[in-house]
Amino acid sequence: METTNKIRAGDVRTASRLIRDLEDRIPGARRKLKDLFVHTGKSFIIGITGSPGAGKSTLADALVHEFRRRSKTVGVLAVDPTSPFTGGAILGDRIRMLRHAEDEGVFVRSLATRGALGGLSQVAGDAIHVMEAMGKDVIIVETVGIGQQELDIVNHAHSVIVVLVPGMGDDIQAMKAGVMEIADVFAVNKADRPGAGQLQTELATLLGTTAIPEGGWIPPVVSLGNLYEPAGFAQQASELAQKVMEHYNHLIVSGRLSGRLERKAMMEITEALRSSILEPVLSRLMSTGELKVMTGRVANRETDPYSEAEAVASRFLKVEGAT
């Protein structure tokens, strides 16, 4: 309970240590998270996704500044599924977050899979819960790309911002089946660049030809211009924060927030099952060398992956109703 009390009091060192232990699958970390869970569920969670180089870190930083201006405490979870957070060019833009380093109302944490078994989504969900238990009013989850893992991660959010930049018009069509469907707010970043008007037109056309989703929310489009014009950029960031808050209020008033919470709970249960069942089985098969043998048999077409999986399941899982 000491860990719980410290985290609830906002102790950054304790929170960082627990997130690291959860990320590294340290024994005992899961029990501490269980104790914290009853103190979660009160934060507003925002997901930010978009192509690499779209300026997501810049927008996340601007939103942190805006929410702090509104006297909200903020947690930021920067997710990198490709490299350990010991440095690297991909983290360059996140250096901007250092301006909040001395602000006790802001807690910034980065995550990486480091090759661990299981989905990155669960690790992100665990970190979100730690930040919730710290009492953060707003939690911003920033992903690096727009792959399936990133889409899974933003499903932990109440509201999702999809960041677009001029020059990626062709990508809008490609993203239809994935990212476009999860957007609650569109942010056209670097809107002072050539092609911004075309991008906004294509986006408006896409939204105009898309059926109004159940619940009646049509994603608004917020344009953000030159970072080096602080006053204008700050005003645009304020508008972005306002639109996201309006979406959250819409979820509450329309009664659709419960659906998002159930979706989030379903994902967490699925990830927890994967962690509790699949990971131990895979670890056992790897340590005994069985997985390598199975892989060889399937690769040589001596058997199929479905039969191998069924055989493993029959060994490790107790079938309901079996005697």
Language model features with spans:
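Conserved beta-strand segments of the P-loop GTPase G domain that flank and frequently precede/overlap
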Residues: S110-L111, V162-V165, A187-K190, S223-G225
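Nucleotide-state-sensitive switch-loop elements of NTP-binding domains
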Residues: E2-I46, S51-A54, L63-Q149, H156-D171
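Long, well-ordered amphipathic alpha-helical subdomains in the mid-to-C-terminal portions
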Residues: A15, S223-G225, E239-L317
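Alpha-helical scaffold elements adjacent to nucleotide-binding pockets in ATP/GTP-utilizing enzyme cores
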Residues: I90, A127, D152, H156, ...
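Signal for well-folded cores of large energy- and translation-related assemblies
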Residues: E23, F37, G41, V64-R68, ...
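Hydrophobic positions on the alpha1 helix immediately C-terminal to the Walker A/P-loop
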Residues: L59
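Canonical P-loop GTPase G-domain recognition
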Residues: V185, A191-L251
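Flexible active-site lid/hinge loop adjacent to a nucleotide/diphosphate
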Residues: I153, P166-P194
